[in-house]
Amino acid sequence: MAFAITQNCCNDASCLSVCPVNCIHPTPDEPDFGKTDLLYIDPRSCIDCGACADACPVDAITRVSRLSPSQAIYAELNADYYRDRPVDHAWGAPTFPPADIGSVSLKRVAVVGTGPAACYTATALLRQTDAAVTFFDKLPVPGGLARYGVAPDHTSTRRIGEHFRSLFVHSRVTMRLGVEVGVDVTVEELSRTFDAVVYAVGADQDRQLPLESEVVPMSARTLVGWYTGHPDVPADAVDLRGVTRVVVIGNGNVALDAARILTAPVEDLVGTDISAHALAALRDSAVREVTVLGRRGPEVAAFTRSECQALVDRTSVPVLVAGDDDLSSVLAALPLSASAAPLATAPRADEAETGDGATRIVFSFGRAPVAVRPGALDVRGSGTSDAGIASSIPADLVLQATGYRGSALPGLPFDADRGTVRNVEGRVVDSEDRPVAGAYVVGWAKRGATGGIGDNKLDAERTVELMLADSLSAATSSRRETAGRRPLFGRAGR
C-alpha cells in the first residue's frame, strides 16, 4: 500500500532525497516544480518504505490505508498526477556544491530576517561553507511568516518552525533579535562588517486596490497579525463588535484563511497558537457570513486546491457559491486538479438571503470591487453574462487580501514597480544593473510575494550557489580581512 502527500504539503522537497525509488515528483529540476499545490507520490512505484513520511517537516505524508475520509481525495490526486506520466522515473545526474569549503572566502555572513527563506539560506551556507552566520530581525522572536503568517489552526504547517529551531542554536550562528536594519544598523554598516549580506525581508505592504471610495478596506495582513499575535499588531486592531457579514476581496489562500478563522467554531481554535485576544473576540463574535470575492472566474482562482478542499470538507460551516447556471457549468468542467474543483459540488447561494442564521462561507466569482461604503461593498460584474453590471454586497467589514509587496530598505536598491529588492537572480543590483558587491536577496523580497514556505528552499539554495560562485571568481569586490573589523555590537552572542 502506497503513501500519499496531503493538504499541508509545504513543497520543502526534503522527502525527495530520501526516496529510494525516485517516485516523488515534481522535483526541483522539473518544469512543474513550484507550479503545483503539492508534491505527488506515484502509487505504482512507491515501495511503502515510509522514508518520505519520516523526512517530511510538516507531517503531510500518510499511508493511504490510514487516510481519514476527508483525506481520501489525496490518494486520488496523487495517482491522478501520474495518469499521463511515465511509470519509470529516471535518475538525473548528481550535483555537488561548486567548491570545497576551504576555498570559499565567505567567513562572516549576515542574514537579514529569520523566516523560511532566511533559514534555508543559512542552512545551505552552514552546510557548504565554514562561514559564521549572524541573523538580524527587528522582532524579538525568530520565525518570520512561518510564525506570524501561518494560520493557528494549521498546526502541521506551523511545525516547520520546529524544523528550524536547531538552526538558531547552531554553534556558528549568532542571533541579533530586536535589531532593525535601516534603523538600528545601516545597510552600509553591514556591508563593511560582513563578507556577504543576504536580505530575506519579505513583503510587508499590501498591493494597492483601485477603489473609487475614500474608505479603504482593512488589510488581511492586519487580521493575520492579529490572530497570530504579531508584536506590531495591537490587540484592538480588529473590532468584530456588530459585525455579522464580512467580504474578503481576493481569493488566494490568505483570503481562505481569513474566512475559515472568522467562521470557525471557537472550540476548534482552543489549544492552537491563536492569540488570546483574538480567541476572546471570536468567542463573542456575531459573524455569520463571509463572502470570498474574486474578480475573475473559478478557472483561475488564486487559492490552492488543498486549501479549498479543506474548507469544503469542514462540516461545521457550509460553503456555498454565488452564481448562475453558467458558473455551475464552468465548475463542473474543471479537471480534478483545478484549484476550484472542490466547489463543483457546493450548493448555490443567493447573497440577498442570510439563510436561517447559520454561519456560512460564500464564494463569489467574476465581480470586481468598486467602492467601500458603510454597510456594503459596491461591485461591478466582470464575467461574460454580467460585464459592467453594478451591484452591492452587504458588508459590516471589508478585508483586502489581494497580495503583498515589499517596501524599500534605506540604502538598498528597490524596484518600486515589482515591490522587491532590485536584483538579478538573487544578486542585488544598482539602478544600472551593476551587482552590488556582497549583497544578495532571497524569498519574497527577491521574486515578489509568490510561493509558499517550501518554494523558498530552492530559491535560497540557488542564491547561495551564486554567492559561492562569486566568492570563487572574486566577483565580489569586498575581500576585506576580518581581523581589522570591529563588531557591530561588541562581543558575539545571542
Feature-to-residue mapping (PLM):
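FAD-site-proximal beta/loop scaffold in flavoenzymes
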Residues: 16, 33, 216-235, 387-447
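Glycine-rich dinucleotide-binding loop and its adjacent helix/turn
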Residues: 75-98, 206-284, 419-429
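N-terminal Rossmann-like FAD-binding beta1-loop-alpha1 element of flavoenzymes
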Residues: 108-130, 255-262
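Dinucleotide-binding/catalytic capping subdomain of oxidoreductase cores
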Residues: 142, 260-385
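Glycine-/small-residue-rich beta->alpha transition segments that form the dinucleotide
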Residues: 195-196, 200-207, 221-224, 251-253, ...
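C-terminal, flexible cofactor-proximal segment of oxidoreductases
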Residues: 427-494
